[in-house]
From Swiss-Prot:
Domain called FAD-binding PCMH-type: residue spans: 29-192
Active site: 172, 221 (proton donor), 291
Name recorded for this polypeptide: UDP-N-acetylenolpyruvoylglucosamine reductase
Organism: Trichlorobacter lovleyi (strain ATCC BAA-1151 / DSM 17278 / SZ) (Geobacter lovleyi)
Stated role: Cell wall formation.
Gene designation per UniProt: murB
Length: 302
């Protein structure tokens, strides 16, 4: 463990968990111990923590909700940062300011009860708002950047609020400076009737359960959809429905979901993902790209 991590307990007010198994915090239920999992109580404590880690060149990453992450079996030599306490919501007419640690589903429900429309699809996407922004999360033709107005980053020790015009984003991606942290986002929503918003949310949940009723631990869609294609269809065409390596398996319900059948390892999932990519390339001539972030044993970044 990095020596500098021990001294954080001298001033840090939030929760600190040393040698914490990542498997407890990742939806795939895999991953070895991280040296330190820190949960700052405020933006200011986050700023102080990130500054110290960077000064001492200690690797770090933002855990988010753990729903789009595949760590290593050996764990992570550095600091994982949870933003779950940085989750405030503020409303100004139809503009919603929400911090990165809030959950997507709680945000979707909160604005729906206010008769605000534009992010109904988030009800079916587990994880945190920061994670949703980082990957430009979306479903059924909608994505979060369709309503993003500004994004606040912690970059080189300073908070920066960037307007939409200065942001670069695309399908399942949002480009941010290396080692910066998404802290908050403002969303431009629109007014609608409470009944209409609730109805669309129920429709989104219905679509999710009809197509993605996967009962085993998973990370959601594992691969991005190639242009004009669906990853699940390509995987199915390659004959991989139900294919497994160790206890990691291609779901028989939705083939773009890789599931943990019980006691799977991160190595099982990495081997399975590699096998899927190889078979799809050989069968369909298309190179799949992971939507899930593969976390090595000590790398910096969100």
């Amino acid at each position: 463990m990095h020596a500098g991590l021990e001294h954080i307990r001298d001033w840090f007010k939030g929760e600190l968990l040393f040698h914490e198994p990542l498997a407890r915090h990742v939806s795939l239920k895999v991953g070895g111990p991280v040296d330190l999992l820190a949960t700052p109580d405020s933006r200011e404590e986050l700023q102080q923590l990130v500054t110290l880690l960077d000064q001492q060149q200690i690797p770090r990453f933002v855990l988010g909700g753990g729903f789009n992450l595949l760590p290593s079996d050996v764990g992570y030599r550095g600091c994982a940062i949870s933003l779950k306490q940085i989750n405030r919501l503020q409303l100004d007419d139809t503009v919603v300011a929400i911090e990165a640690g809030a959950s997507n589903q709680s945000l979707a429900r909160a604005v729906a009860e206010l008769g605000l429309s534009g992010i109904e699809f988030l009800i079916g996407i587990p994880g945190s708002v920061g994670g949703a922004v980082r990957m430009n999360a979306g479903a059924h033709g909608s994505d979060i950047f369709s309503v993003v107005k500004t994004v606040t980053l912690l970059d080189q020790g300073q908070f920066r609020e960037l307007p939409r015009e200065q942001l670069t984003y695309g399908y399942r991606c949002f480009e941010i400076p290396d080692n910066s942290v998404i802290v908050a986002v403002t969303l431009q929503l629109s007014e609608d009737s409470l009944q209409a918003v609730r109805s669309r949310m129920e429709e989104q949940l219905g679509l999710r359960w009809a197509t993605q009723n996967v009962k085993f631990p998973n990370a959601g869609s594992f691969f991005k959809n190639p242009p004009g294609e669906s990853a699940w269809r390509l995987i199915d065409q390659a004959g991989l429905r139900g294919f497994s390596i160790g206890n990691a398996q291609v779901s028989e319900v939705h083939t773009n979901f890789l599931i943990n059948r019980g006691n799977a390892t991160a190595a099982d999932f990495r081997a399975l993902a590699a096998a899927v990519k190889e078979r799809v390339k050989a069968t369909c001539g298309i190179e799949l790209e992971e939507e899930v972030q593969l976390l090595d044993s000590g790398e910096c970044g969100q």
